[in-house]
Amino acid sequence: VLGQRLRSISPGIAAILLLAVMFFVIDARVSVAGADEVAQKYRFTELEIDYPEGYDQLPKRNIREVNESYHKIRSWISSVGASIAVNDLTGHGVANSLCFVDVRTNEVVVTYAPTAPAADRFEPFLLDPAPLPIDHTMAPMGCVPGDYNLDGRMDIMVTYWGRVPILFLRKAGTELPANEAYHRQEILPQDSPDGRYHGPKWHTNAATVNDFDGDGKPDVVIGNYFPESDVLDPDGQDNVEMNDSLSTATNGGGLQVLRWHAATAGETPSVTFVPERGAVPFAKSTGWTLALGSADLTGRGLPDMYVANDFTFDALLHNVSRPGRIKFEAVYGERSHGTPKSFQLGKDSFKGMGVDFGDLNANGSFDMVVSNITTAWGLEESNFVWVNQAGSEEEALQSLSAGSAPFIQQARPLGMAWSGWGWDVKFADFRNDGDLEVVQTLGFVKGDIDRWPWLQEMAMSNDNLLSNPAMWPNMQPGDDIAGDQPLAFFARTDSGEFTNITEQLGLDVPIPTRGIATADTRATGALDLAVARQWAAPAFYTNEAPDLGDYLNLRLYRPTLDGTDADLPGTPAYGATVTVTTADGRRQVSQLDGGSGHGGKRSFEVHLGLGDATGPVTVDLRWRDLDGDLHSTTQQLSAGTHTLVLTDRVQEVPNR
């Protein structure tokens, strides 16, 4: 009888034991030995950001007005938009200016970094799109600094929900950034006979800028989330929808590829971009895109692109462009019997939220890190760390040309698989020791009532129901999903694994974050950190690590398009790559990043930590000149900051 009773309850005992094992497994996922010891090597101090005069008097919101069909999920619809960028907006040589979107006011704020010296400070201001048409059905989503008309002056592209991006082109003869110092231009011409906007209703959450066709000029790829519809119009048509699947959605806003065509400088500067139809395979151009990144994986001066999509497959797009024609082909990772389906690059069903390229293992090749939703007991996917398996750029080209992506997914062995509801993610070397850290924004909707059960119930529903917003669970002010998750700061331990030390560093503020930007704002070689928070003020952290290594900081320019202003160092060398070899044989590759990720844009300097390396290092430079000709050179450079002008050769000029 006792044996029968034991047999009858054994399934329950097994289930309890399984749950206990799972608890300890999940607990171990986010706990790596050595976190406290590693954290002692870092230190950050938050500094106050200066705002425009009277900014504190502006009304502050905590929710958006949305289409009536979205009202029941308006907190979900209101969950994005905070973004931040750090760059050299003054033109003085140091990246110590900030541009950020504050969703509380729906304003774009331009100010100086708290670390900026007096000479680089200016009156903070709001970037007003007038006289271009804008109304309550539109909202800014991102700042993307860049020199779009190639005149040597830093411009700003602002992306939006509800319209195409606006370019704020810096006028000649203006000394410091100010609202009146910029000429406004639609990125694509729009007719407005009545002063109202009648153009495409893009809903942009991602942008990357690079020379994609190899002509020496910066092209722009826009990633849109919602399809064209009245998302933010409470009086709009009932034309809105949600994703038609949680894993294979194809009804998103997708990609827009814009090829640089022509530009002028002066008091009314201009630039012309041409839409490049068919640049991306149709099946890869209709996703719910949240992040974009690009890097030259093959050494041809043609950057490949990673597309991070919500609700459907991510995509790695191999660049097969020629001057005047941008073209990408989709490539896929290999899958063995032991590879989970979603760990095959380009075939995953996870929620791609952020992406960055960097040389994680310091072997001279670009790896990739991708944010997903990885909340234990909530929605537990895995972040991606795609480690490059190609032995050389030539081998990478051979694989990609055959349609194969030479990457394997290593997030779990490296300790970065699980963190929370991920968004923007960035590589950076905050200690200058030659090892990259990974910073990731986290959190979704902050409130008081836990709504994870509703979300989990929806995740198990039939895909045929999902596109109708009425079938989604309520998500209103007061509801909470992952609302108390602080950003993650992954640092490498002695074992080679990474561990999240955000709590030890005091960065564990329980507010959802969206964008990350890094820059050497003090010209000391230490990368500072700026963070955009959703429905809260952004934060700026100065890097006070106690024992910094040597570094190489390269400011890379090409001559301006007209070459007339001798007071300007030049225009950023979009697409330039740098490989540094130290005396011990260690190789690191990096690039001038013209803009990547989700809600954050790092500065343009190419920063590499050298650790304890002594003496000059070997620097391999590869770039295209303004005519599109590809050049490369190898030279010795000492540690520190160097300003280099790239033509058909390399000329070092004094740092500004």
Describe the function of each predicted region.
Residues 2-75, 79-83, 482-485, 492-493, ...:
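Gly/Ser/Thr/Pro-enriched helix-cap/hinge segments flanking short amphipathic alpha-helices
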Residues 14-19, 145-175, 183-185, 199-228:
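Hydrophobic or amphipathic alpha-helical targeting/insertion segments
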Residues 34-38, 106-127, 164-186, 232-247, ...:
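Beta-propeller blade repeat segments, especially FG-GAP/WD-type strand-to-loop junctions
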Residues 53-83, 131-143, 190-208, 251, ...:
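Repeat-based blade/solenoid architectures
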Residues 80-91, 110-111, 139-154, 203-218, ...:
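Beta-propeller blade termini
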Residues 96-102, 143, 153-160, 220-224, ...:
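Hydrophobic beta-strand segments that make up the repeating blades of beta-propeller
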Residues 201-212, 216-221, 348-449, 511-548, ...:
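Repeat-solenoid scaffold signature
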Residues 224-250, 371-378, 444-481, 562:
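Short, conserved, GDST-rich strand-edge loop motifs in beta-rich repeat architectures
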